[in-house]
Design a protein with these regions (language model features):
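P-loop NTPase catalytic phosphate-binding loop
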Residues: 1-103
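Phosphate-binding and hydrolysis-coupling loops of NTP-dependent motor/remodeling domains
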Residues: 7-9, 27, 50, 84-85, ...
């Protein structure tokens, strides 16, 4: 993706997602989780530039068209995925498209459980230097953790959970 190009932002989510409360116009396109694979595949045929694809609760999004898997493998170089999911829901999905994303060992774990979330992207320190309150956790780049504050409790209340 060229640094000068601003990507379209597409989102995949269902009615249980906090993204349903996003202000109008935040996303260029929105896809329902249940049929997202086919819809995104069709939309990619018309994409005129780079795309940032946000997928909330990726563990609940199937990929019968293998489009998400193809994006992760680099078949669509101008399309990038940011996917969310709970580690306990993602871990048992051995043949799911999200497994390929986890192999990059790059992501974030918010308020991690050190007993169950230790291996999502890399090793989480057993003891945090501060309390891991709302929005706090670790970001990983190639398996190396960095303590982060991704949002504040006030943001969560004002934005309907976003």
């Amino acid at each position: 993706m060229d640094a000068a190009e601003v990507p379209e932002v597409w989102a995949v989510f269902d009615q249980r997602s906090g993204l349903v409360n996003a202000p109008e116009g935040v996303f260029d396109r929105v896809f329902e989780s249940k049929n997202a694979s086919a819809q995104v595949q069709a939309a990619l045929q018309d994409a005129a530039g780079p795309v940032l694809l946000l997928i909330d609760d990726g563990d609940r999004v199937d990929d019968p068209m293998n489009v998400f898997d193809a994006i992760v493998k680099g078949d669509f170089p101008d399309v990038h995925i940011i996917a969310t999911g709970k580690p306990t829901d993602l871990r048992p999905l051995y043949s799911h498209w999200t497994k390929a994303i986890r192999k990059f060992r790059t992501g974030a774990v918010v308020q991690p459980n050190v007993d169950t979330d230790m291996d999502m992207f890399g090793s989480i320190p057993r003891r945090a230097p501060v309390q891991l309150s709302v929005g706090r956790g670790y970001a990983f780049l190639a398996g190396s953790p960095v303590l982060v504050q991704l949002m504040s409790p006030e943001d969560s209340q004002h934005r309907g959970g976003l």
